[in-house]
A protein has these predicted regions:
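Short, glycine-rich nucleotide/cofactor-binding loops
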Residues: 6-18, 77, 145-155
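Short, acidic/small-residue loops that bind anionic groups at enzyme active sites
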Residues: 110-144, 199-208
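Short helix-capping segments at alpha-helix termini
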Residues: 29-31, 49-57, 169, 196-201
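Glycine-rich phosphate-binding loop
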Residues: 91-110, 184, 191-231
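Phosphate/nucleotide-donor binding subsite
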Residues: 53-97
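N-terminal phosphate-binding or glycine-rich loops at protein starts, especially the Walker A/P-loop
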Residues: 1-45
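Glycine-rich phosphate/diphosphate-binding loop of Rossmann-like nucleotide-binding domains
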Residues: 18, 34-36, 42, 147-206, ...
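Short glycine/serine/threonine-rich phosphate/pyrophosphate-binding segments
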Residues: 15-20, 82-95, 99-113, 120, ...
Length: 231
C-alpha cells in the first residue's frame, strides 16, 4: 500500500512552529507516512534547533507569511495568499498530498478548503466535523463556521459524516441524528423532512442515492442528547 502524504501547516496554532514540528515527528514515528512541512523556513529551522528536532526526514516548503487568529478569513485568498496555510492548501489541490493538517485560523482554513481545494461534486457546503469522546465513536457534523444552512445541506452532511465513520471506524451503517439547538418541537419542518430516513440524496455523484442510516431527531443542547445519538 502506498504511504499517505500529509501536508502540515506548521505556522498555525499556539506555540508554532515548534509544537507542529514535534507533532509531525511523533506522527511519523507512530504512524509512518510522508510529511510535507510548510512554513517560514527560518522559523521552522530555528524551532527545530531549539528542540533538537532532526528535519532531515521531512520535506520543507517555505511560505512568505502567516495567517493570525485575528485575520479576516478571506485573507487566505488575497492578502496572504503566500501564507503557510494557503501554500499547504494549494499543494493539496495540486495532488502533492492526501490531507492538510492545520491548527490555525479556523475561518481561513474553512474558506481556503472550500475555495482553493474545492468541494466534492454534489456537496454544496463544507462542514466542520468533531469526534466526540464518548463510549462509542461519535461524530458531530457542522460544529462550527456555518451560521445558517439550507435544508438540502443536511443530508449532504449526513452522507459525509457516514463516509467518515465508515472509513475511520469501520461502521457500515452509522446512526445519524438531527440535533437541534433548542427545545421546541420542530423549529424547521423542512430541515427535518430533508433528513428523513430514505430521503433521496440528489446530486451526489458516486455516492449512494439513499441514506445508509437511521434518523434520530433530538431536540436539546445537552450532552445527554448527544449520548442518545451515539447509543
Amino acid at each position: 500500500m502506498q504511504q499517505k502524504r500529509i501536508i502540515v501547516d506548521c505556522m498555525g496554532g499556539d506555540h508554532a512552529p515548534g509544537e507542529m514540528l514535534a507533532g509531525a515527528v511523533a506522527a511519523k514515528a507512530a504512524l509512518g507516512g510522508e510529511y510535507l512541512l510548510v512554513g517560514v523556513r527560518a522559523e521552522m529551522e530555528s524551532a527545530a534547533r531549539a528542540r533538537s528536532i532532526d528535519l532531515s526526514a521531512f520535506e520543507l516548503r517555505d511560505a512568505g507569511s502567516v495567517i493570525g487568529m485575528e485575520d479576516d478569513p478571506m485573507c487566505v485568498l488575497h492578502a496572504k495568499k503566500d501564507s503557510s496555510m494557503a501554500v499547504a492548501l494549494r499543494a493539496l489541490r495540486d495532488g502533492e498530498g492526501d490531507a492538510v493538517v492545520s491548527t490555525g485560523n479556523t475561518g481561513a482554513l474553512f474558506t481556503g478548503a472550500s475555495l482553493i481545494v474545492r468541494r466534492m461534486q454534489g456537496i454544496h457546503r463544507a462542514a466542520i466535523a468533531t469526534v466526540l469522546a464518548f463510549e462509542k465513536p461519535t461524530l458531530l457534523m457542522d460544529s462550527g463556521a456555518n451560521v445558517t444552512v439550507q435544508p438540502d445541506f443536511l443530508p449532504q452532511f449526513a452522507v459525509m459524516g457516514s463516509a467518515y465513520m465508515k472509513g475511520l471506524f469501520g461502521i457500515e451503517m452509522p446512526r445519524v441524528g438531527l440535533l437541534n439547538n433548542g427545545t421546541e418541537a420542530c423549529p424547521c419542518r423542512r430541515r427535518r423532512t430533508a433528513c428523513c430516513p430514505g430521503c433521496p440524496v440528489s446530486g451526489l455523484s458516486g455516492m449512494s442515492s439513499r441514506m445508509p442510516c437511521r434518523l434520530t431527531c433530538v431536540m436539546s443542547r445537552s450532552r445527554t442528547a448527544l449520548r442518545a445519538i451515539s447509543a
